[in-house]
Amino acid sequence: MNIWDFQTRLTRRLLIWSVFSVALSTLTFFSANSLLRGLAIQFCVWGIIDAGIAIFGAQVSVKKRLKVQETDLAESEAKEIHWLERVLWINTALDVLYILGGLWLMQTKGVESPLWRGHGLGVVIQGGFLFFFDFFHAFSIRNIRPS
């Protein structure tokens, strides 16, 4: 597998997660349970953002691949691998902050408000998924070798 195939798989997986998140949010948004409503709002917002990132990332990847000349393929792939690995590790660190922020929200505003507890839980779940997603892909990218 080359870096371009890897990026296609990565963005496709993120898009699937985003569709799942938005679909799940529509099922729980109109719940009488405030906690579920807060969770639904977070799943919807994160799902939309993740979809945007996945679509944009896929488009950028295709454009970069089309610009690469066969004579520069190995060098371009090496640069892309290095760049994407760095982005994934940075995102993994940011995901920890999202999780901590969600926990903080649950333990502050969420103590007295089920809606805010749902918001916090939604951030923890979404941040947790992204942590494992980014970590897995950052670790997996090390197996890719430029052509």
Where are these regions (language model features)?
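Alpha-helical membrane-associated segments of multi-pass integral membrane proteins
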Residues: V96, S113-A138
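Alpha-helical transmembrane segments and their membrane-interface junctions
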Residues: A93-E112
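Membrane-helix interface/capping segments
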Residues: I55-E80
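Cytosolic-side membrane-entry/anchor segment at the start of a transmembrane helix
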Residues: M1-S18, S147
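Loop-to-helix transition at the N-terminal end of transmembrane alpha-helices
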Residues: S34-G52
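Juxtamembrane loop-transmembrane helix junctions in multi-pass integral membrane proteins
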Residues: N2-R9, S31-G38, D72-W89, V111-G118
